[in-house]
Curated annotation (Swiss-Prot):
<feature type="binding site">
    <location>
        <position position="229"/>
    </location>
    <ligand>
        <name>Mg(2+)</name>
    </ligand>
</feature>
<dbReference type="GO" id="GO:0006164">
    <property type="term" value="P:purine nucleotide biosynthetic process"/>
</dbReference>
<feature type="region of interest" description="Binding of phosphoribosylpyrophosphate">
    <location>
        <begin position="299"/>
        <end position="314"/>
    </location>
</feature>
<dbReference type="Pfam" id="PF14572">
    <property type="entry name" value="Pribosyl_synth"/>
</dbReference>
<comment type="similarity">
    <text>Belongs to the ribose-phosphate pyrophosphokinase family.</text>
</comment>
<keyword id="KW-0934">Plastid</keyword>
<dbReference type="InterPro" id="IPR000842">
    <property type="entry name" value="PRib_PP_synth_CS"/>
</dbReference>
<protein>
    <recommendedName>
        <fullName>Ribose-phosphate pyrophosphokinase 2, chloroplastic</fullName>
        <ecNumber>2.7.6.1</ecNumber>
    </recommendedName>
</protein>
<dbReference type="InterPro" id="IPR029099">
    <property type="entry name" value="Pribosyltran_N"/>
</dbReference>
<keyword id="KW-0460">Magnesium</keyword>
<feature type="binding site">
    <location>
        <position position="216"/>
    </location>
    <ligand>
        <name>Mg(2+)</name>
    </ligand>
</feature>
<dbReference type="Pfam" id="PF13793">
    <property type="entry name" value="Pribosyltran_N"/>
</dbReference>
<keyword id="KW-0418">Kinase</keyword>
<dbReference type="GO" id="GO:0016301">
    <property type="term" value="F:kinase activity"/>
</dbReference>
<dbReference type="GO" id="GO:0000287">
    <property type="term" value="F:magnesium ion binding"/>
</dbReference>
<feature type="binding site">
    <location>
        <position position="214"/>
    </location>
    <ligand>
        <name>Mg(2+)</name>
    </ligand>
</feature>
<keyword id="KW-0545">Nucleotide biosynthesis</keyword>
Length: 399
């Protein structure tokens, strides 16, 4: 790990701060937030007139950096992908939810991002037309179903149908963040299981395969009647942490009992670090209460691991408890930055040394703050797509 850290420390995107100095005061720095270099154009047709509406924030003259791992072995694999990736049967299209990620994935594979026209009519209906042939092609549709969830999900359904009617050989939906994944069971009577419904609708629309990243509950993978490849964002976060000088006094913390398996796997890969658990009781939707700590964090650097950060109530309450129990510094690591209000206020309040997320969800500028670091998962998704396209093993990517 030391050799890897030395090799990666020269990257201009790597923070100069070290985990071995947790007591250092929080310094203001430019947030490493994802912003698209290209805008997603959504056309609204109203009374015969065409108006333009931008689906993402305006790009800035100097977009903040997104840290991408540069391990030599990984670079060799990606070089092979770029060399062999000029396969006319491989087509990658993007919806409006996260075009910058889709563009980066296509660039890694050495292919052009597919041309597609996506329009919104005056009454809100969605129109999709593919601008190139997909007959006999393996089509991959990149679309996280993040906020606005229903809008992005419906747009994905329409894109799937357009590809199916255009005689695509296979249709794989790439969903970096799977909305409704938390509605995976009936907690009370007369409730819907929306995760299962979403899986059914994706199948009925015409999907042949699904690629998802760090779905909230792995049992939801069984809701699909088609093949599902479940990939993990942990390697991206672990590579970033490996680029820093890791303190020996390190502890991985699960912010709730439900995330223990995830945190234990993370701790094992992080030099077999000790594990601590925050026990809490949830009082209602988007509300939680931290009860007590299981484990020792006194004088240690705490790395909190979760699959997503929504309102940040759970993770900030847990971080406050860790501070009370004597943790020198607290880092938050999560694959999905949902960031529903009041998450930004909670996360930027100074309790976290750093908040580390991936670009599975496109973050607008108003959701960026000084402690935020965004890591790119494009290379991980690109390798997965290539293995699926070539009928290779996806699990081998994570070994």
């Amino acid at each position: 790990m030391a050799a890897k850290a030395a090799a990666l420390s020269s990257s201009p995107f790597v923070s100069s701060r070290r985990l071995s100095s947790p007591a250092a005061s929080l310094r203001a720095r430019t947030p490493r937030c994802v912003m698209g270099s290209e805008q997603v154009r959504v056309v609204v047709e109203e009374e015969g007139k065409t108006k333009k509406r931008m689906g993402v924030a305006e790009p800035r003259s100097a977009p903040p950096a997104v840290w991408t791992p540069r391990a030599p072995a990984q670079e060799a694999r990606l070089a092979a992908l770029r060399t062999d990736g000029r396969d006319s049967r491989l087509k990658i299209f993007s919806g409006t939810a996260n075009r910058p990620l889709a563009q980066e994935i296509a660039s890694y594979l050495g292919v052009d991002l597919g041309k597609v026209l996506i329009k919104r009519f005056a009454d809100g209906e969605i129109y999709v037309q593919l601008q190139e042939s997909v007959r006999g092609c393996d089509v991959f549709l990149v679309q996280p179903t993040c906020s606005p969830v229903n809008e992005n999900l419906m747009e994905l359904f329409v894109m799937i149908d357009a590809c199916r009617r255009a005689s695509a050989r296979s249709i794989t939906v790439v969903i970096p963040y799977f909305g409704y994944a938390r509605a995976d069971r009936k907690a009370q009577g007369r409730e819907a299981i929306t995760a299962k419904l979403s899986a059914n609708l994706l199948t009925e629309a015409g999907s042949d395969r699904v690629i998802v990243c760090d779905i909230h509950s792995t049992q939801a993978l069984g809701y699909f009647d088609i093949p599902v490849d479940h990939i993990h964002g942990q390697p991206v976060i672990l590579d970033y942490l490996a680029s820093k000088t890791i303190s020996k006094d390190l502890v991985v913390v699960s912010p709730d009992v439900g995330g223990v398996v995830r945190a234990r796997a993370f701790a094992k890969k992080l030099s077999d670090a000790p594990l601590a658990i925050v026990d809490k009781r949830r009082q209602g939707h988007n509300m939680s209460e931290v009860m007590h700590l299981i484990g020792d964090v006194k004088g240690k650097v705490a790395i909190m691991v979760d699959d997503m950060i929504d309102t940040a109530g759970t993770i900030t309450s847990a971080a406050a408890l860790l501070k009370q129990e004597g943790a020198e510094a607290v880092y938050a690591c999560s694959t999905h930055a949902v960031f529903s209000p009041p998450a930004i206020e909670r996360l930027s309040g100074g309790i976290f040394e750093e908040v580390i997320v991936t670009n599975s969800i496109l973050l607008p500028e108003h959701k960026c703050f000084p402690q935020l670091t965004v890591l790119s998962m494009a290379n991980l998704v690109a390798e997965t797509i290539w293995h699926v396209h070539r009928d290779g093993s996806v699990s081998s990517i994570f070994q």
